[in-house]
Amino acid sequence: MEKLTIRSIDRKDLNKASEFAAQGMNYSSYTENPIVLYLYRQYALSSLLIKSTVTLGAYLDGQFVGFLFARFDGEPKVSVSWGRRLFVTVAEKLIGLTGYQGAIGAYDRANQEMYQEFATNRPEGEVTYFAVDPALKGKRIGSRLLEEIKKNYKNKRVYLYTDSNCNYQFYLKKGFDIFGRRPVDFGGEDSLTCFLLSAIL
């Protein structure tokens, strides 16, 4: 019988975590350039790791199969190497010089607008980054990660950002509600809807 263990993520698994996130969040739909895709998935994971206070990993018979990062008020942020911090700083400057700045800016503005409306609810935490191995759907890996957060942070009001390119329906099945939604048009046929979801754990 397979054994699923939820514990603090091993740093050696961060690269695999970025792969799971890129697949689950369909990053490849934004670019066909493999170098840009690799750099962006590393940037996304690193920038969200830096702001997190909880970094859980899921291990199925010892194999890394998923993760959940979160941030809660009053808790210290996780330790992050100076090299990873430097990478985020450099990546942000490079993004500013590329054609992706407009798209990323529009996405971020949509999230900021929703949060400004939501902030009066006084959230105590945020699920910052969350993905599982897409090849292992149906094994309740994502559910177990969320259950671990609920167990440790019962009755806390949390929120998260997601979009229509992701499996946001998963969260709705787990008790999250849609607080806000914003359409984002990247030009041409490329568009999506950003969501802010919230729940009391």
Task: Describe the predicted segments one by one.
Residues 124-125, 152-164:
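Conserved GNAT acetyl-CoA-binding A-motif
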Residues 132, 138-151, 173:
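Conserved acetyl-CoA-binding loop-helix of GNAT-fold acetyltransferases
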Residues 3-19:
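A short beta-loop-alpha structural element at the N-terminal edge
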Residues 143, 164-181:
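Conserved active-site alpha-helix within GNAT-family acetyltransferase domains
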Residues 34-55, 60, 69:
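Active-site rim helix/loop that mediates acceptor-substrate recognition in acyltransferases
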